[in-house]
Curated annotation (Swiss-Prot):
InterPro entries: Aminotrans_V_dom, Cys_dSase_SufS, Cysteine_dSase, PyrdxlP-dep_Trfase, PyrdxlP-dep_Trfase_major, PyrdxlP-dep_Trfase_small. This is Probable cysteine desulfurase. The modification N6-(pyridoxal phosphate)lysine is found at residue 216. The lineage of its organism: Archaea, Methanobacteriati, Methanobacteriota, Thermococci, Thermococcales. Keywords: Pyridoxal phosphate, Transferase. It comes from the Archaea. It comes from Pyrococcus abyssi (strain GE5 / Orsay).
Amino acid sequence: MRIPEDVRKDIPLTQEVIYFDNTATSLTPKPVIEAMDEYYLRYRANVHRGVHRLSQMATQKYEESRKVVADFINAEFDEIAFTKNTSESLNLVALGLEHLFKKGDKIVTTPYEHHSNLLPWQRLAKKKGLKLEFIEGDDEGNLDLADAEKKIKGAKLVAVQHVSNALGVIHEVEELGKMVKEEGAIFVVDAAQSVGHMEVDVKKLKADFLAFSGHKGPMGPTGIGVLYINKEFFDVFEPPLIGGGTIEDVELCCYKLTEPPERFEAGTPNIGGAIGLAAGIKYIEKIGIDKIEKQERKLVKRTTEGLDELEIPWYGPRNLDKHAGVVSFNVPPLHPHDVASVLDEHKIMVRSGHHCALPVMKRLKINGTVRASFHVYNSLEEVETFLGVLEELVKSLRSSQ
C-alpha cells in the first residue's frame, strides 16, 4: 500500500479538505463504513441470549470484534470491555476502584493530563480524603523521571497519558510502568492519542487498566471506546454499571454477576460501533503501524521546521523522537480561534482552544493554542499548503505593525 496515496483513495473527504484535526477525531475509511453498513443492513439485531439467526450472527461479529481489539493491544479476549469513549472508560476505573481507597492514600498523575484523566481522580481524592500528587516536568511536557520515582513511592494508583493531546509529547510509559509495578501500585494508562498511531502493548506497558476511543487513531466510528482490565483485577474491580447482561443469577434479595467481559457491559452495547472499530483496526494493520508512525514523524518534522522558519512559536518536545503527530502553536497577537478561522477559509481543518488541558495552558501562560494533528492519510503537500497560508498570514500581520 502506498502511503498516503492509497489510504486517501479510501477517504473521499481528503479530496475536499486538508484535515489536520485527527487528535479530536480521525476520518473514516470506506472499509469501516462498509462493515457497519453490513451490520445495519444484513444482520441488525441485539447480541447475546437470542436464539434466532440474526442475533446469533450479530453476537458472533460483536465478539469477533472484541478479539480483534484484544489482539491489537496484546490483551486477552475477556480483558476487553466496550464503552462509549476514553472519558467513560477512565471514569469507570475511578468508580470501580473507589472501594479500595482509604483516607490518606496517594494517587499520582502528571500536570499534562487531559481533563478526563484528571477530574475523576480529583473527585475521588476529594470524596475519600486522598493525596493527589503530580510528577514534575518541563514546559515541553517532558517528565522528570527521577521525580516520578520519588512520587510513585507509596502510591496506591498512578494514572498517566501515553501521549499528550495538547503538546504531543510521548511519555515514557513503559519505564513508568516498571516503577509502578515495583511499588505494587495500580497503573492506569490513557492511550487515547497513541492507539492507532504507534505500537501499544498492554503487557510491555505493565498496564492494569488502559483506555482509548475508537474514533481517534483506530479510524473507527464515534460512540465506541475500550477499557482494558487486567484479569488480575476481575474480582477487585466493581462494575459501576450493572443490570441487563451483567448477571448470572438474580433473586429479589440479591444478584450474582456473570463472568467478564459481560459483567462490565450493562445493557445493549454499541454493536455497530464495535464492528466498525474492529474494521478500523484491521485497516490499520493492513497499512502497518510502523508505516503510520513513520509518516506522522515526517509530517511533524516538516511542520516544526516550517514554523521555525516563519518564527511562529510552537509547543512540545524539541526532541522529535518524543513528539507524536500533534503540533500546537500560536500566531501572536491573534487568538487561536482567529487563526483557525483563517485556515478554515482555505479548507484547512485544525483545532483551537485549550484542548481539555487547562492546567497546561495556565502553566504556559497562554489562553490556548492552534493544534494541527496528523494521521497516515495526511501528506507533505498538505503541510506545505498549510505553511503557505500561515506565511501569508504572518506577512500580513508584520506589515501592518
